[in-house]
Amino acid sequence: QLSLPAWNFATPYSQLSASVHLPWSALEPKGVGVLTTSIEGHIGSEDLKSVMSMVDAGDAAQMIPSAPLQLALVANGNMDHLQLTDCKAQLQGMLALDVKGDVYHLVQDTLSATSNPMGAAVNYHLAFQNMKPLLSRLGVADTTLCIPMGTSVRGRVDMEGNSYDATAAVKALDGFIDLEASTNLD
């Protein structure tokens, strides 16, 4: 088993704290062990640029906004059922993503793939604030794409095997639109 009760990482620009408890049996297809993990912190733009230069990402490092990337993750479960109780990413003042839900049958043997296909039931919320700095770094002109401040997208994604269902409620300014989509890739 892997057990990291408290792990901290810091640079002048970033800070991450984590705890992990992982019995090896949690990684088996019908695992009985329970993984518990918690990660929280922020990654500064200078550190992101350093990593991107190490992986030879070309001009992509220039697109990173100056705001730090804030992260939070709390997950419990095993390969049969993993619960995401808190999963957040935020570029302060620009956008925030919040995801919660359940993922099922992450690892399968060939016999159980048809009787217990991989599945998920996930709720999400994406909130846009001032996107102009990020869009300009990406080379997108204001006239090409405009995301009004306060725009939000809330919805749900359900998946079972190759069958997908999704909903989204988009609110921007004084308007809104509700969307639904389904597909089966079989």
Across the structure, where does each feature detected by a protein language model lie?
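Outer-membrane beta-barrel translocator/channel fold
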Residues: 44-52
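Short acidic/polar N-terminal linker immediately downstream of export determinants
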Residues: 65-66
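Extracellular/lumenal and peripheral-membrane lipid-interaction modules
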Residues: 135
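Extracellular loop and loop/strand-boundary signature of outer-membrane beta-barrel proteins
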Residues: 57-61, 139-142
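Extended lipid/amphipathic-ligand handling interfaces
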Residues: 1, 6-9, 16-41, 69-80, ...
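Intrinsically disordered, low-complexity segments enriched in glycine and mixed charged residues
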Residues: 124-126
